[in-house]
Every structure is written in C-alpha cells, then in structure tokens.
C-alpha cells in the first residue's frame, strides 16, 4: 500500500487580507500541519434559501495521520464562519513526501 497523508481543505472570507490568512495558516502549522497552500477562489453556493457567489480564500493543508485530529480541532476552534467548510481525506503520496509530512 502506498504511503498516506491527509489533505484538509477549508475556505476563509475574502475580506481577510494576506497577512490575516498567513497568521491563520501559521496557527495551523503550529497545530501540526506540514504545509498550507492558499489562493483566492470564487465560490457559488446556497445560503439561507438563496444562491450566493463570493470570493473566498481556499486553504489546502497537508497533514500527517498523527497530527490530523489536532489540526482539525484547531481549525474548528479558530474558524471565523458559523458553518465552515472543513473537508478532509486520506491521499496516497510518494514515500519521500509522506516522510517529509510526517517529520514536519
């Protein structure tokens, strides 16, 4: 079986500026994430009976199996949305990358 890591995704408000997103990401690194990529996206979704479209920040985290519970707990505790998108799954990776994620 190929080595596995966790990939975690969430979104943050577009009203946040880059340093705020960076500080949020830093707190998740301190909670155990190995790597966090963030980028600006446009989301279209249903909210309170209406179809909405807005810009947001997407964060994608790479996390070891040992650290995932702590990272998810920190993410839930610190997230600014009342109903945050927090999705996560196991992903196969190269042995070298999994080793790096585990050691980060």
Functional labels for PLM-detected ranges:
Residues 1-104:
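Positively charged, small/polar-rich N-terminal and surface patches that mediate targeting and assembly
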